[in-house]
Amino acid sequence: MVDYHAANQSYQYGPSSAGNGAGGGGSMGDYMAQEDDWDRDLLLDPAWEKQQRKTFTAWCNSHLRKAGTQIENIDEDFRDGLKLMLLLEVISGERLPKPERGKMRVHKINNVNKALDFIASKGVKLVSIGAEEIVDGNAKMTLGMIWTIILRFAIQDISVEETSAKEGLLLWCQRKTAPYKNVNVQNFHISWKDGLAFNALIHRHRPELIEYDKLRKDDPVTNLNNAFEVAEKYLDIPKMLDAEDIVNTARPDEKAIMTYVSSFYHAFSGAQKAETAANRICKVLAVNQENEHLMEDYEKLASDLLEWIRRTIPWLEDRVPQKTIQEMQQKLEDFRDYRRVHKPPKVQEKCQLEINFNTLQTKLRLSNRPAFMPSEGKMVSDINNGWQHLEQAEKGYEEWLLNEIRRLERLDHLAEKFRQKASIHEAWTDGKEAMLKHRDYETATLSDIKALIRKHEAFESDLAAHQDRVEQIAAIAQELNELDYYDSHNVNTRCQKICDQWDALGSLTHSRREALEKTEKQLEAIDQLHLEYAKRAAPFNNWMESAMEDLQDMFIVHTIEEIEGLISAHDQFKSTLPDADREREAILAIHKEAQRIAESNHIKLSGSNPYTTVTPQIINSKWEKVQQLVPKRDHALLEEQSKQQSNEHLRRQFASQANVVGPWIQTKMEEIGRISIEMNGTLEDQLSHLKQYERSIVDYKPNLDLLEQQHQLIQEALIFDNKHTNYTMEHIRVGWEQLLTTIARTINEVENQILTRDAKGISQEQMQEFRASFNHFDKDHGGALGPEEFKACLISLGYDVENDRQGEAEFNRIMSLVDPNHSGLVTFQAFIDFMSRETTDTDTADQVIASFKVLAGDKNFITAEELRRELPPDQAEYCIARMAPYQGPDAVPGALDYKSFSTALYGESDL
């Protein structure tokens, strides 16, 4: 028997249809093409014929009842062609030619031919089916004709993901029944025998009608009858199959099953459209949620970084001076710890923040979303401004620390100098008041008086010589006050005491002179030799005291030149020692001569010079002290010279490394700039090259670490300048940070270009052409085009943006797309986005609104219940939380405005 049932492989009925397939969804191929000769005399399989009669009759009646009629016997009731024409009018919605009402055979044949002609006009080639067979009641041909009508008007338009007809209907069934246990739809015969697939289809769309979990696979008749009864009662799908026939047939008739299943498809077609709309909305919402997650990450990272900057700047701007150098050195150590430990992670966070921001903006542009505008105060520019403020505060803080350390060092030096001079002066003034108050002249002889007068003159000479020391003490105290020395109170007290004592000495000296001069008239004797001794011994004694002060004086130098200057001065001082020694011997010779004269004249001396307290023993003692201090001074100067030579070595060592690292960083910066402009090869090649370049930069880090170690030694040695190099550690650090940031940003730009290329389908040749056009107008090779450069580029590409009103408006529109932040510059990434957008379709707000309208059943609003039914739970709640209440005249309680929500997704309104 000829198997015309194989025709279900395509939209035709005939023995050769199995080879045509369902791949031509829009094809009106030969529905009845022959594979072998059609044997009209062969009979249908009785079981299949029975199933087809029942199914096709029910299917026809489901449509004929709309016209108020039905058929009882499918091969008898269509013989006159009247109900056949009526059926075609109902299912097509079109008017057929007026039928002939005669009862003769010719009238019937003409009516059937009108029906067959109408079928053929729909692109269906009827093979081997003629009006005579239908009029004669040929069951095989009548069933074949009805199957052809079912294929054309009920199954042909079924399309699921580029498939159609049988394959589309089968794929639809597989998807709908996939979640159900014991259901595996692979065909339209035995996959449906247990009835579970029918129940699964109903439960998938109307779960309240079927208690699927209570169905048993081993009770197919119950399952089938349950599905048929529910479909007829609640879905208005007539019972087209008989449960016992399906169960008792080894292989149920495919056409009968497909006809019945197609009724389910059409009954649930609205739900199918809703599912498609829901999938589109889910896709759009998934993109939006991912972008919102990236925005939240950016906001948090930006907030944390800005908070750290906000907390750090006050610490760097705290310039409260400390009292001691130890406290300031601790502050300097804390600052170095901040530079080494706390700041580097924040530099990486800042770089990562810029990368995340650029990636987010690229994704937003690719998904046709508005550019991301961070919260107020959290723009990349705000972070850069805060970072710049931080680095300015950091630089000022370091300079302040070093200046404070220098100030405290000078204060310590001045304080020690003040104490030395004050101690020497106090030692000199000790007993002077008592001496000036002594009234020894009242009982002295004339010679004694003259001696007292000479002694007093010598004292006045000595007093005048000490005037410079007192002024130096006062000047040092004043400088300590001006430099805010922490122990200024004690210094001022001691200085005031010295000044008060000095004034008292001046007053007492004046009083004693008056007393001596008053008595002088009565006294004549004077020992000129002692007087000469006193006059020469006092200056010499002062010279030795000054020399001892200078030899014990502390010194602070920072360069070899300064220490060599001190050594030169010391050598010059040593060259004066022979003359000083001769002066000492001359003074001692005067003393010896006085003794010789006294002895020769039998003069009994008191043992001391009446005119001075400076004895030869004092002169010799101080001279010996000077002789001892000279080699000590030599040793101290040589030690300092060695220290400065070591410091010079550190300077040269640092300069040698810095003069290599600094130009290397500058060269790498220039090379990166050149690479970012030239960009030879594919984007993947460029990305690989840049990452290799980045690794070479990272591998260079040990050279920077070595320089940091050398810089640490310089700082520990308190070396504040270096004439051998123009590069400071701060310059090197800033250059290194800029180098890392630049290579990371360049890599990110290439990655974004790859992302844009893949998302938009841009070829490598197009990308290179875009780069060539961009570089041609990027005259300064800055990586961005100004408005005039960009306009010239657009004109070269054929855009009408001339300087007339219409061209200016078009140019302003394009600028708003490529420069949403109004920075006045168009980056290469923005240029690529614009060019790709001109040739690529993207989803729009109108598409999303249309999808929501499908879910809402063509209403202007949607309810939370409808959203929860059609969308996944998280995305349904996302929409409910953000949709505004619908305010239209047709609003119902709980109505939501999906139109404003959809436009807000694309930046056309506010959420």
Swiss-Prot record:
Entry-linked InterPro entries: Actinin_actin-bd_CS, CH_dom, CH_dom_sf, EF-hand-dom_pair, EF-hand_Ca_insen, EF_Hand_1_Ca_BS, EF_hand_dom, Spectrin/alpha-actinin
Annotated phenotype, changing residue 262 to P: In FSGS1; no effect on protein abundance; no effect on homodimerization; loss of localization to the nucleus; prevents nuclear localization of the wild-type protein; decreased interaction with PPARG and RARA; loss of transcriptional coactivator activity; dominant negative effect on nuclear receptors-mediated transcription; increased actin-binding affinity
Binding site for Ca(2+): 778, 780, 789
GO cellular component: actin cytoskeleton; cell junction; cell projection; cortical actin cytoskeleton; cytoplasm; extracellular exosome; extracellular region; extracellular space
Modified residues (Phosphoserine): 696, 909
Modified-residue entries (Phosphothreonine), positions: 249
Keywords for the protein's UniProt record, in alphabetical order: Acetylation, Actin-binding, Calcium, Cell junction, Cytoplasm, Cytoskeleton, Disease variant, Metal-binding, Nucleus, Phosphoprotein, Protein transport, Repeat, Transport
Consequence the record notes for mutating residue 255 to E: In FSGS1; no effect on protein abundance; no effect on homodimerization; loss of localization to the nucleus; prevents nuclear localization of the wild-type protein; decreased interaction with PPARG and RARA; loss of transcriptional coactivator activity; dominant negative effect on nuclear receptors-mediated transcription; increased actin-binding affinity
Repeat region (Spectrin), residues: 293-403, 413-518, 528-639, 649-752
Main location as per UniProt: nucleus
Localization, UniProt: Nucleus; Cytoplasm; Cell junction; Cytoplasm, Cytoskeleton, Stress fiber
Domain Calponin-homology (CH): 50-154, 163-269
Residue numbers bearing the Phosphotyrosine modification: 31
Xref: PANTHER family: SPECTRIN/FILAMIN RELATED CYTOSKELETAL PROTEIN
Protein function: F-actin cross-linking protein which is thought to anchor actin to a variety of intracellular structures. This is a bundling protein. Probably involved in vesicular trafficking via its association with the CART complex. The CART complex is necessary for efficient transferrin receptor recycling but not for EGFR degradation. Involved in tight junction assembly in epithelial cells probably through interaction with MICALL2. Links MICALL2 to the actin cytoskeleton and recruits it to the tight junctions.
Disease: Focal segmental glomerulosclerosis 1: A renal pathology defined by the presence of segmental sclerosis in glomeruli and resulting in proteinuria, reduced glomerular filtration rate and progressive decline in renal function. Renal insufficiency often progresses to end-stage renal disease, a highly morbid state requiring either dialysis therapy or kidney transplantation.
The protein's name: Alpha-actinin-4
Organism: Homo sapiens (Human)
Source species taxonomy: Eukaryota, Metazoa, Chordata, Craniata, Vertebrata
